[in-house]
Amino acid sequence: MKIGIIAAMPEELKLLVEHLEMAKKHQRLGHVYHTGRIGHHEVVLVESGIGKVMSAMSVAVLVNDFKVTAVINTGSAGAVASGLEIGDVVVADRLAYHDVDVTAFGYDYGQMARQPLYYEASRYLVEEMKAV
């Protein structure tokens, strides 16, 4: 399994880049993609920039150009919850938009038109992450 790891800001990716073995750099669409290994995992690291559009663009490159089979978002992931400390790991089993409101058209808050309210995470990856 090749894992893509995406972070919005350099501070969120720095430690992972420092631990990357057999590291190579690749330029794509104005971003640097770092390939190599962390432990026994083949990984591709990228600082996407902040926001859903930047993140989506970087994930598209990870999937299309680098053929990753899983993507992990590292960093604050767009939110800071009380009670969480630096280094805590949050594993989501489902995700939803926090900034979408088309309730005037009969959708639930957080649901994009003609899309599910929740996006389910891979059960396999959730269980693997919980086992660590």
Model-derived features with residue positions:
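N-terminal short beta-loop-beta anion/metal-coordinating cradle
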Residues: M1-F66, Y97
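Short, active-site-adjacent cap segments at secondary-structure transitions
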Residues: E12-K14, G78-A81
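Mid-sequence, gly/pro-rich, charge-dense loop/helix-turn segments that line enzyme active sites
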Residues: V80-V132
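Proline-aspartate-enriched helix->loop->beta-strand connector
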Residues: V68-I72
